[in-house]
């Protein structure tokens, strides 16, 4: 009997953390500062990227307190192959291949925030959207290729592939609606995603998410519509 219960517990744990789960209207909650709590995402496609778009929601009270990681995509050749990072001086850092550009914001909203970031290698053009509104386009790492077999982490910034976390860069708050495509979304498509559309994401799909949660991470209903 004990052996049967143990097997059932293993099966439940496995399906919860490694299966493709529909996360519709759900969010990952990181309730406290930590260097051990994070969510690892497994991409549907593990190929190199010459174009991509990442969109997500996050909600935190840290924005005026300290900097923190929003999205960390490390490869074996570069721990910051794709990085979205909030700086407490009212700037988002967007990085590709270790190179970075920054986007200033005029005010810090005390509300859930939706962001989309896209990049294409052929031109180096970066687009960064906050709550459905675009910032001025910038140029970054023209001709670069993002590496394959990524380690994708929510809640922490990777200083090495899959690790070397710093609690002072951790997210405290909620994150959800994390979707990623291997192409640049058009302005019309960004608007669709902002109001809740998904457009069949083919790298990370929030409606069929393959993830593993580690530490104090909880799944709760989203606090945004």
Swiss-Prot record:
Q: Which domain of life is it from?
A: Eukaryota
Q: How is the cofactor bound?
A: Binds 2 calcium ions per subunit.
Q: Metal-binding: is it a keyword of this entry?
A: yes
Instruction: Give the GO cellular component terms, alphabetically.
Output: extracellular space
Essential cofactor(s): Ca(2+)
Q: What sequence ranges are listed for the domain Pentraxin (PTX)? A: 24-225
Extent of the signal sequence? 1-19
Task: Tell me the residue numbers annotated for binding Ca(2+) 2.
Answer: 157, 159, 169
Note one Pfam family from the annotation.
Answer: Pentaxin
Query: What is its biological role?
Result: Displays several functions associated with host defense: it promotes agglutination, bacterial capsular swelling, phagocytosis and complement fixation through its calcium-dependent binding to phosphorylcholine. Can interact with DNA and histones and may scavenge nuclear material released from damaged circulating cells.
Kindly provide the name given to this protein in its UniProt entry. C-reactive protein
What organism does the record attribute this protein to? Mus musculus (Mouse)
Tell me what gene encodes this: Crp
């Amino acid at each position: 009997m004990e052996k049967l219960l143990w097997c059932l517990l293993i099966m439940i744990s496995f399906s919860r953390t490694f299966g493709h789960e529909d996360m519709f209207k759900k969010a990952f909650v990181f309730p406290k500062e930590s260097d051990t709590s994070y969510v690892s995402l497994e991409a549907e496609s593990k190929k190199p990227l010459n174009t991509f778009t990442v969109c997500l929601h996050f909600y935190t009270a840290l924005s005026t307190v300290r900097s923190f990681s929003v999205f960390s995509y490390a490869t074996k050749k570069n721990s910051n192959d794709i990085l979205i990072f909030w700086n407490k001086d009212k700037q988002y850092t967007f990085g590709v291949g270790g190179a970075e550009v920054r986007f200033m914001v005029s005010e810090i909203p005390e509300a859930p925030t939706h962001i989309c970031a896209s990049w294409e290698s052929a031109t180096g053009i970066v687009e960064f959207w906050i709550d459905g509104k675009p910032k001025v386009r910038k140029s970054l790492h023209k001709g670069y290729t993002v590496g394959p077999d990524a380690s994708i982490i929510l809640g922490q910034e990777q200083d090495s592939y899959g690790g070397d976390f710093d609690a002072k860069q951790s997210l405290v708050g909620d994150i959800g609606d994390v979707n990623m495509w291997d192409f640049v979304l058009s302005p019309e498509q960004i608007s669709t995603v902002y109001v809740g559309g998904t457009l069949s994401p083919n790298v990370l799909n929030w409606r069929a998410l393959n993830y593993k949660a580690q530490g104090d991470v909880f799944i709760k209903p989203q606090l945004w519509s």
